[in-house]
Amino acid sequence: MFSNIGIPGLILIFVIALIIFGPSKLPEIGRAAGRTLLEFKSATKSLVSGDEKEEKSAELTAVKQDKNAG
């Protein structure tokens, strides 16, 4: 999604943000964006690990059923 944004594009976005929000608000906005990104990453990581746990649980159940049947 953002792979096409280069250095000039990032500089342009930063300058526009500086004009809109002013220099005093930029650190606060940066911290908020960083926290949001961190929460998003941890949420996606927990979703992925939850899926892996479900797959392992299903495999263990299948193995137990095969062992009990055989």
Swiss-Prot record:
<comment type="similarity">
    <text>Belongs to the TatA/E family.</text>
</comment>
<protein>
    <recommendedName>
        <fullName>Sec-independent protein translocase protein TatAd</fullName>
    </recommendedName>
</protein>
<keyword id="KW-0963">Cytoplasm</keyword>
<dbReference type="GO" id="GO:0005829">
    <property type="term" value="C:cytosol"/>
</dbReference>
<dbReference type="GO" id="GO:0043953">
    <property type="term" value="P:protein transport by the Tat complex"/>
</dbReference>
<keyword id="KW-0811">Translocation</keyword>
<keyword id="KW-0813">Transport</keyword>
<comment type="function">
    <text>Part of the twin-arginine translocation (Tat) system that transports large folded proteins containing a characteristic twin-arginine motif in their signal peptide across membranes. TatA could form the protein-conducting channel of the Tat system. Required for PhoD secretion. The cytosolic fraction of TatAd binds the precursor of PhoD.</text>
</comment>
<keyword id="KW-0653">Protein transport</keyword>
<keyword id="KW-1133">Transmembrane helix</keyword>
<keyword id="KW-1003">Cell membrane</keyword>
<dbReference type="InterPro" id="IPR003369">
    <property type="entry name" value="TatA/B/E"/>
</dbReference>
<dbReference type="InterPro" id="IPR006312">
    <property type="entry name" value="TatA/E"/>
</dbReference>
<dbReference type="GO" id="GO:0008320">
    <property type="term" value="F:protein transmembrane transporter activity"/>
</dbReference>
<feature type="transmembrane region" description="Helical">
    <location>
        <begin position="1"/>
        <end position="21"/>
    </location>
</feature>
<dbReference type="Pfam" id="PF02416">
    <property type="entry name" value="TatA_B_E"/>
</dbReference>
<dbReference type="GO" id="GO:0033281">
    <property type="term" value="C:TAT protein transport complex"/>
</dbReference>
<comment type="subunit">
    <text>Forms a complex with TatCd. Two types of complexes exist: one composed of TatAd and TatCd, and another composed only of TatAd. Soluble TatAd forms homomultimers bigger than 100 kDa. Soluble TatAd associates in homomultimeric micelle-like particles with a size of about 12 or 25 nm in diameter as well as in elongated particles of 12 nm in diameter.</text>
</comment>
<keyword id="KW-0472">Membrane</keyword>
<keyword id="KW-0812">Transmembrane</keyword>
